[in-house]
Design a protein with these regions (language model features):
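Short active-site segment of divalent metal-dependent hydrolases/proteases
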Residues: 121-129
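Alpha-helical transmembrane signal-anchor/signal-peptide segments
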Residues: 28-38
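Residues that scaffold the ATP/ADP-binding catalytic core of kinase and kinase-like folds
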Residues: 73, 127-128, 160
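N-terminal Sec-pathway targeting helices
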Residues: 1-13
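Post-HEXXH active-site segment of zinc metalloproteases
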Residues: 114, 118, 130-159
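Auxiliary, metal-adjacent structural segments of Zn-dependent hydrolase domains
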Residues: 17-20, 24-28, 42-104, 109-113, ...
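Long, well-structured alpha-helical subdomains associated
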Residues: 162-180
Length: 180
């Protein structure tokens, strides 16, 4: 990594990060209700960087697992709502918020159960990336991918969005914070 890559995180405040794009911060949010992970919660969480094994069900195998992802998200404090995603042309977005899990917004449109599953799994990979960054940033999990998206977090999510069973297992192993 060159010196410019080291300085990039300092040049871009976290409040303007929306997965896949940079945007202005939203200042009319309610006060944070979910603190950053404490030391003990960090110790109990799974290893998000562990590469997905091929032993878990995929969206092709069981697209209904998307509903379990949504339930785990609610347990952890992720708000999922229907509406217009923050990024133009996207069917869903996750907004990483400093110090707490953010919301997922999903566009309501007809889609097959498998596509819906991959869409939801994709957004929860961004949740895992946010957890990997201790709710302070959105870090790569380190799962290898050949997906060509120029944004590394997006490439990682697109490259593994079919791995719903593994994403679900990581969310199920993630402890709730004390505010939940």
């Amino acid at each position: 990594m060159n010196w410019k890559g080291c300085l990039l995180p300092l040049a871009l405040p976290l409040s303007v990060l929306v997965i896949g794009s940079w945007r202005l911060a939203v200042f009319d949010r309610p006060p944070p209700s979910q603190p950053a992970l404490t030391g003990s919660a960090q110790d109990l969480r799974p290893n998000y960087a562990q590469a997905p094994p091929g032993t878990y069900p995929t969206c092709q195998d069981d697209p209904a697992l998307a509903d379990l992802l949504l339930a785990e998200g609610r347990r952890l404090g992720v708000t999922v709502r229907a509406g217009q995603p923050e990024l133009p042309g996207k069917d869903a977005t996750y907004r990483a918020e400093p110090g707490r899990l953010g919301p997922i917004t999903i566009k309501q449109r007809p889609m097959s159960p498998v596509v819906r599953c991959m869409l939801i799994s994709h957004e929860f990979i961004h949740v895992l990336q946010h957890l990997q960054g201790d709710l302070k940033g959105v870090l790569l999990l380190g799962w290898s991918t050949a997906h060509p998206d120029p944004i590394p977090q997006e490439a990682e999510a697109y490259g593994h969005q079919h791995r719903v069973g593994y994403v679900l297992s990581l969310l199920q192993a993630t402890p709730r914070t004390s505010a939940n």
